[in-house]
Swiss-Prot record:
Coiled coil: none
GO molecular function: 4 iron, 4 sulfur cluster binding; iron ion binding
Annotated cofactor note: Binds 1 [4Fe-4S] cluster per subunit. The cluster is presumably bound at the interface of two monomers.
Binding-site residues for [4Fe-4S] cluster, renumbered to this chain: C149, C152
Entry keyword annotation includes Transferase: no
Protein name, UniProt field: Fe/S biogenesis protein NfuA
Listed NCBIfam families: PRK11190.1 (NF008392), YhgI_GntY (TIGR03341)
Assigned protein family: Belongs to the NfuA family.
Length: 191
């Protein structure tokens, strides 16, 4: 479910040494399965453990996950990274905003999952997003761009060289992608 690197475990171990005996960590998702999902880590003293919690035992620490957050923390990773500028704890949870979809799920759901968990986080850096509108009978994924992608001069490149390549690689049953957005250049456009 969650991978916690050795560096992160060492970091937590130092922090937990200053807490009440028996305290571990809790990993959670607020607003799971929504675009507003946020992940967090907090202390979990012994009296805060719920019967429905999942206990993840690692080499140096244990982590508790509440029942609601668990499916959204699938494939999550916590790391502690140190570089010339300092150090920081990172929590990557690719399924926090959308529950992981099974390989046997309908094509529409699998494509939507990839868009939401892999493509849109990249587009969000430019204030953009893409939505799957439909998959045609001839295998075309019809997409609509929004935010900073609407009217962006790089949208064709993003569509063909980024999104289409990634989707065709993951879903050989697709034949291509098409953009149905009525692009209007404005202050919202990234380029």
């Amino acid at each position: 479910m969650i991978r916690i690197t050795d560096a992160a475990q060492e970091h937590f171990l130092k922090l937990l040494a200053k807490q009440e005996e028996g305290t571990q960590i809790r990993v959670f998702v607020i607003n799971p399965g929504t675009p507003n999902a946020e992940c967090g880590v907090s202390y979990c003293p012994p009296d805060a453990v719920e019967a429905s919690d999942t206990v993840l035992k690692f080499e140096k620490i244990s982590a508790y996950v509440d029942e609601l957050s668990a499916p959204y923390l699938e494939d999550a990773e916590i790391d502690f990274v140190t570089d010339q500028l300092g150090s920081q704890l990172t929590l990557k949870a690719p399924n926090a905003k959308m529950r992981k979809v099974d390989d046997s799920a309908p094509l529409m759901e699998r494509v939507e999952y990839v868009l939401q968990s892999q493509i849109n986080p990249q587009l969000a850096g430019h204030g953009g997003r893409v939505t799957l509108m439909e998959i045609t009978d001839d295998g075309m994924a019809i997409l609509q761009f929004g935010g900073g992608c609407n009217g962006c001069s790089m949208v064709d490149y993003t569509l063909k060289e980024g999104i289409e390549k990634e989707l065709l690689e993951k879903f050989p049953e697709l034949k291509g992608v098409r953009d149905l957005t009525e692009h209007q250049r404005g202050e919202h456009s990234y380029y």
